[in-house]
Amino acid sequence: MTAVESRPAGVALTPSPGAHRPSGARVKAFVALTKPRIIELLLITTVPVMFLAAQGVPDLWLVLTTTIGGYLSAGGANALNMYIDRDIDALMDRTSQRPLVTGMVTPRECLAFGIALAVISTVWFGLLVNWLSAALALGALLFYVVVYTMLLKRRTSQNIVWGGIAGCMPVLIGWSAVTNELSWAAVILFAVIFFWTPPHYWPLSMKVKDDYARVGVPMLPVVATNRVVAKQIVLYSWVMVAVSLLLTPLGYTGWFYTAVALLSGGAWLWEAHGLQNRAKAGVTGAKLKEMRLFHWSITYVSLLFLAVAVDPFLR
């Protein structure tokens, strides 16, 4: 039985004919399709990299156009993701209030909205930023929608590892927006986000693994024990912190960034090893405290990239 066939009675993916959908609520629903909270994290990595690339304050008009373009591109990717995943979203508690599940937006509207944002964002980047940034943004969108959502998500426990590449692209976009080229600094920060993504997302997946198991999505916490997942989190965390420290010896950052990277990275490793110790001890449920690392991961990436932006002014 497929996820769609097993959908509980009363859960609709499209509104009933004549369903009342207030215009204000409809606007909010279309905004929700873009997943604004996820996009906040993407922009946290984009704008600071522009400061590093400019070695100071970048052109503010360029920052604005890049930010808007990034929102449109990521929003389009997220809308298309919701269109593709609408069957399993209806079965998961965490996603049960998404616009396609509640019927506030129809699948056809969502698909058209996502495609429109993809086209508009690509043209926006090309005309107002540069075509390298446009190509990177389009590549990120296609990778997220096709490679992650369509090919990896429902097939492999390594889905978030390789699918996370799309979430690394804003770093490259921010750098290319300023310089119209890429450099090792951008590649290093890309790698930081690449190794950050699994230990950021797996703790959340541990919390909601029953949701994923119900719809047959093989997230690592679904197919492996907490002990195995925690070990993987620790391994990725150590690599992430090590990679974050490469910027300074290569001459891209100075003492301030290094201090923040060491302190925040040390705190991250403390939390990661704490989770591993609890998992080894067989702790389950609320006492596992896996969400502590999830929340800290957001603080960590915010602090690290704030340091990326501030460091050029202190050298």
From Swiss-Prot:
Catalyzed reactions: heme b + (2E,6E)-farnesyl diphosphate + H2O = Fe(II)-heme o + diphosphate
E.C. no: 2.5.1.141
One GO location term (cellular component): plasma membrane
The protein's annotated pathway: Porphyrin-containing compound metabolism; heme O biosynthesis; heme O from protoheme: step 1/1
Membrane topology per record: Multi-pass membrane protein
Gene3D superfamilies: UbiA prenyltransferase (1.10.357.140)
Region (Disordered): 1-22
Keywords: Cell membrane, Heme biosynthesis, Membrane, Transferase, Transmembrane, Transmembrane helix
Main localisation: membrane
Subcellular location: Cell membrane
A GO MF term: protoheme IX farnesyltransferase activity
One GO term of the biological process aspect: heme O biosynthetic process
Transmembrane portions of the chain: 38-58, 60-80, 100-120, 123-143, 159-179, 184-204, 233-253, 255-275, 293-313
Pfam families: UbiA
Other noteworthy facts: Carbon 2 of the heme B porphyrin ring is defined according to the Fischer nomenclature.
Entries under HAMAP family matching the protein: CyoE_CtaB (MF_00154)
Family note: Belongs to the UbiA prenyltransferase family. Protoheme IX farnesyltransferase subfamily.
Its biological purpose: Converts heme B (protoheme IX) to heme O by substitution of the vinyl group on carbon 2 of heme B porphyrin ring with a hydroxyethyl farnesyl side group.
This protein's name: Protoheme IX farnesyltransferase
Organism: Streptomyces griseus subsp. griseus (strain JCM 4626 / CBS 651.72 / NBRC 13350 / KCC S-0626 / ISP 5235)
Record gene name: ctaB
